[in-house]
Amino acid sequence: RACPRLAGFLDEVRTRHPDYHARPVPAFGDPAPDLLIVGLAPGMHGANRSGRPFTGDHAGVLLYETLHRFGYASAPQSISVDDGLTLSGCRITNAVKCLPPANKPEPGEIRECNRFLTAEIAALPTHASILALGQIAHQAVLRALGLKLKDHPFVHASDYRLPGGRRLVSSYHCSRYNTQTRRLTPEMFAAVFTLIQSENRSCPSSPSSSPAR
């Protein structure tokens, strides 16, 4: 058990919720995507329950609606692992694979899980874009790539060209708190995807009505 705190917490969760997934949550989507979306970690009653990233809690509502609008998802909702939803040109993962207490992974846990993110990024096509949701995911991507944080600060809608041809675009996380406080609006989130698709010629077709940038 590489992360004793997380492993112990998952043991407790499985006892309280025997029907929950309560294990590391694998990535979901296209195995050779144009876009890799990196979140923070599974949510207690979302991915930790369902076994699919951003599925079953509020954080996935805006994400999957936007993915469907921009042609990446076959449906605007992700309900369960057996709902038939598919992603095309897109894959979703997390910086930390296991549910952390209070949704707050410790620095050592983020570092321990970074090897999985490193492998996921290494498997991407050279033209792929990476969308980091939130500062921790942004920093985890940079760590996985061996890049300095000070040279690539987290800013909403930032767009960094990476060595080898890939891009790192970052956004505020689509959490309930951020969307309810309007720190992140649907229009802001859609603008991030417009930015991603603006120079990604192999991406799915743009939506019928793109937001102003």
Language-model features, listed with the residues they occupy:
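A polyanion-binding, active-site-adjacent surface
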Residues: 1-201
